[in-house]
Amino acid sequence: MFYGTHFIMSPPTKSKLKRQSQLLSSMLSRTLSYKYRDLDSTFSSLGASDDPAELSTQLSAPGVLKVFGDSVCTGTHYKSVLATGTSSARELVKEALERYALDPRQAGQYVLCDVVGQAGDAGQRWQARCFRVFGDSEKPLLIQELWKPREGLSRRFELRKRSDVEELAAKEVDTITAGINAQARRLQRSRAKGTPTPALGDARSSPPPRLRRTVSETSLSPVNALPAAAQGPEEPGPDAMRYSLYQSPHLLLLQGYSQQHDSLVYVLNRDRHTVGQRTPSSKPSISLSAPDILPLHCTIRRQPLPDSGQAAGRLVLEPIPGAHISVNFSEVGHRTVVLHHGDLLSLGLYYLLLFKDPAQAQPLPARALARLRAVPQSCRLCGAALGARGAASPTQAALPRRQQLLLEFEPHLEDTLLQRIMTLIEPGGDDHKLTPAFLLCLCIQHSATHFQPGTFGQLLLKIARLIRETVWEKTKELAEKQAQLQEPISLASCAMADLVPDLQPILFWMSNSIELLYFIQQKCPLYMQSMEEQLDITGSKESLFSCTLTASEEAMAVLEEVVLYAFQQCVYYVSKSLYICLPALLECPPFQTERRESWSSAPELPEELRRVVSVYQAALDLLRQLQVHPEVASQMLAYLFFFSGTLLLNQLLDRGPSLSCFHWPRGVQACARLQQLLEWMRSAGFGAAGEHFFQKLSCTLNLLATPRAQLIQMSWTALRAAFPALSPAQLHRLLTHYQLASAMGPMSTWEPGAQDSPEAFRSEDVLESYENPPPIVLPSDGFQVDLEANCLDDSIYQHLLYVRHFLWGLRSRASPGSPGRPGSGASQPVCPEGMHHVVLDGHLEAPSCPLAPRDPGPAAREVAPERTLPLRGAPWAQAPPGRQPSRGGSQAGPPHTDSSCLLTPPSTPLGPEPGDPDWPESGGPCGKALPERQRNGLSGLRGAAPEGDSAALAEESPPAPSSRSSSTEDFCYVFTVELERGPSGLGMGLIDGMHTHLGAPGLYIQTLLPGSPAAADGRLSLGDRILEVNGSSLLGLGYLRAVDLIRHGGKKMRFLVAKSDVETAKKIHFRTPPL
């Protein structure tokens, strides 16, 4: 309704129509001018005439590009294609191929070229001077706008074959520029190494000496005679480099790091050479590229002889502090070493060089030849063969490889170890979900390679049965919980949020069983082959071999049973949730309005569809969280799609008439819901599976969504052709119950033909069967557990270290550190009591504690009682693979203490003694503050450090697994503590476990100062063991170095601590009064 002036509508006149058409045409022309404004602005300065330098474009025909194709199609000059400023070269190639009647799908075999040449007069051919190939994504018209050919030359775009262009480019090799750059590189190398380089003219006449590729005259064979040119001084000429090898000492590379950067010979013809790694701030004269080489690693200088007035003298090597240098496989340390002919220099972990002095003119000494034979053929860092490592990139070689992954245990600890691994990981935690499979594979590997033949077969059976029992118990608990739900089943009773925690352990062990099954299938034949060879050697019977083979086959069958059973149980319970929420997709009212927020860019899913999608998404998230193999996860989703599609189709065909689903509005609504569901499946990566298992339902809904006017015109034959996925019985069911109008029945044209009549009236063929689900196929690749992998997940490695620590605890319980065996009769060396530190301040002026302590005076001396060292029964004697316990010899008598390490004030108490009221009991609070009466009860420093204290820890230090992965009641509980230094430091008194009654290596807490950060944390207690400091493991560190690492760890520090039981804490704390 209009308010105000009333308008009278009348048909327009011819003049008005003409005027409107003119306005419309002018508007369209302005619109087009905006589109090509950028393109036309290029030629605006050229006037109305065409540019003679541009042969492929014309101002009079903007947007038209001439592509010349003489080399592609003989007899054709050019073809015109439409182009804009944003057209890419790839698109123009396709358009040009269509214009030349060639297949556009072969566009990869052609390229568009920007050719600059000279267009002759009439009748003369085009002469190309140079050309450039356009990249596929380049914009030819934009490049044409940015640069122009110089005056007198023209430019045109040509279509050429890629093979012709590559052949032409291969013929034109720029030898002049390459020679200049090669000479520049030679000059740069000669300046870096201090060696003369021949002139450019001489280099062309004679090839340069190939020092980087051949041993040349510096081979290991003896030098028989010096050349005549070396007998007198001579100006450097073309052979100066070759002669300098006879005149000057040099280093011959035997083992290097990088074939690309290392030189074979380093000539020492200066008074001073610096050796190191080249950095922006350091440019040594001898550059080495290994990562463990310091920017300034060492210095080699010429030292004049004291009794000789000649300038020539001997060469000495001066190491830099912190550099790893060995001469003849002996550590240099901080001392200066005189180099002799035939010495072997080891720089870092990679470089091995032979020092040769031609002035001595003698064969290599016999000791040098013996050392050469003893050169290790493997890398001292990673153990890899040096020949195989040569092709490795510096980045890969710079990363230290993880040590060999082993899990050693004794046969009597097998059951306890398996039980600990089975309960190590909580399925709902944050740890790596395949940790049990990895650890169990390590157990199988150790049993097969170290135990008696046939033992690992029983271990396989034991593992498989444990997993089966665990899965059975979890599914039994889930079934009992589901049975307690109230009937009838509702949406609230079968929510996925309540179902996920119960499905986690089942899927968790299904995932680990898949990895274990593949490992057994791959490794068991190798173990059996090795076992067969051992049985042949020992002459055993075949019964043991057959029993082991039978046990392994039975174990694989049990694991397959676990996988299939867990798969079935998970599908059953998820399908139970789908059974409740799927029918709502068909029962929703037609054309209901969807709520959508004003800021929402896309409509939200309707509630009934959102519930279905949430079930799929929860199942998918659960499979990915528990790291189920992707193929198995896809098969489980496919099974859920099969169930959903079959259920919806059967409900539609069975209950469709009663739900009023067989008419057009409901068909359109249900079809839209299905399309939204399929769109989600495509976004989740399961589009193909969704379309396959929902094909019949989609076909049914498309029929119901067909407009009535179109549907009544279709015959039975046409409907069969339009909806081929439906069987005759299903199509007949839909057509006979389709609701055209209130008084109209089915059309006569919908009657089935004579050929389909028998099948159309079979009522048993209407509903789909659930008996043909997609098959469950175990995967054959894509597994994650690999014991030989170079890179291992940190979480798995942490739990491996934890299990090693757990085994160490079992061994220490079985054989506690006690004095020597009675009746041995052998005299044992005495062991002084270990040093005791309270970490107070990390910023001390005193240097770090040396391994050879100084005598601070008699006031700081105490003598510990003599006791024997534990031998076979000691836990530290059972070292893990690849590590031997080593300890410096202890000396009897009063030990010396370094004054720089006396961090404990004289009034610091050492904590309660066993039996005192304040001694912590089992389960009591950790880190309880000491009573006031004990603060000044003791004075003086107890304990001392023996000389040469370099004890190596004999067991692995386990980083902490997640808090949900380990029971707090276990004495091997590992946790992380972050402490910040206070005014008095950290407030922890530390002691070496080897100097206590525990008799095991390690850094243990012996005291906690009241009110200190360590006591205030509340988790630390006496007897706890420090495993890591700021991520640095204390494995292999001596006591003094470990304490020094803590002292200089910064203001905020992070400790990895292993909780000890009360018995261990008593052994750590108990001290005998000094004699």
Swiss-Prot record:
InterPro entries xref list: CBD_Rasip1/Radil (IPR037983), Dilute_dom (IPR002710), FHA_dom (IPR000253), PDZ (IPR001478), PDZ_sf (IPR036034), RA_dom (IPR000159), SMAD_FHA_dom_sf (IPR008984), Ubiquitin-like_domsf (IPR029071)
Q: Which residues does UniProt assign to the signal peptide?
A: none
Give start-end ranges for the coiled-coil region(s): none
Q: Where would I find the Ras-associating domain in this sequence?
A: 61-164
Q: Residue spans with biased composition (Low complexity)?
A: 225-234, 950-967
Instruction: Please give the family membership noted in the entry.
Output: Belongs to the RADIL family.
Query: What does this chain do?
Result: Downstream effector of Rap required for cell adhesion and migration of neural crest precursors during development.
Q: What is this protein called?
A: Ras-associating and dilute domain-containing protein
The UniProt gene name for this protein comes to RADIL
